[in-house]
């Protein structure tokens, strides 16, 4: 192999590595809900890049239970979510609910209790021992 051919191969490999790094870096991103479009069931997240610069995601669907059983739990502004984008491709991305935050704290720390808390203050509470259901 001649030097010029070797240089071309190395440059091609460098380009491939750079593309793979971008794909891996874009697979999972964490952000907060900026906008919810209830009609199209899509959400826009405020994300940041590796340098800390903020940017808005495109409107992407959020994950829900959607088989025979269905759920409707639209995200709310400020909620933390994870954007899963196969191969870093935002066109395929889906937003999934994430962790608690200062704005959206956990409703309990009791390991024996299950709570579903909704907007408007309504709460369903189940005690693991079967003693309570509210």
Regions found by a protein language model. Give the residues of each.
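Exposed beta-strand/loop interface patches that mediate assembly or binding
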Residues: 1-129
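Short, intrinsically disordered, charge-balanced linker/junction segments flanking boundaries
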Residues: 131-134
